[in-house]
């Protein structure tokens, strides 16, 4: 892929258009942004380079977001991974993909369920020391009790989706280009 060259080839842009909701113009704009973020010019964005983005640096879930962007698990994000992940947040992105992304934030081990421990870990990232561990555990227990319909002590994707069914994910998980 042409991430090390100065521009994307037309066939690369066309291929990315098929898998995302981005226009050719948006893909080219995102590529320029990607190249600016790729400080060392190696064609990937490292975790350190991601942390230089002011909006992400202050996000308590930044490490979880980066790990989800990094589909192949090599510790950095190439342009194909970057555009695929951002397409979830496109205004034309569907609610299902937004739900799947949100679920992955909580499903740390990727087993398809959000356990008590995973929910505690992610919520701890968000609240820091603003709540005691006891208070946080009470919130986790209550959340699982309310969302866990089959009584297995964890939250499946279906249970997660149902719990968030009344949330406005289309707007809350959308970035404007």
Swiss-Prot record:
GO molecular function, one term: calcium ion binding
Gene3D superfamilies on file: EF-hand
Keywords recorded for this protein, A-Z: Calcium, Metal-binding, Repeat
Pfam families: EF-hand_7
InterPro entries linked: EF-hand-dom_pair (IPR011992), EF_Hand_1_Ca_BS (IPR018247), EF_hand_dom (IPR002048)
Family, similarity comment: Belongs to the calcineurin regulatory subunit family.
Function description: Regulatory subunit of calcineurin, a calcium-dependent, calmodulin stimulated protein phosphatase. Confers calcium sensitivity.
Name by which UniProt lists this protein: Calcineurin subunit B
Species this chain originates from: Naegleria gruberi
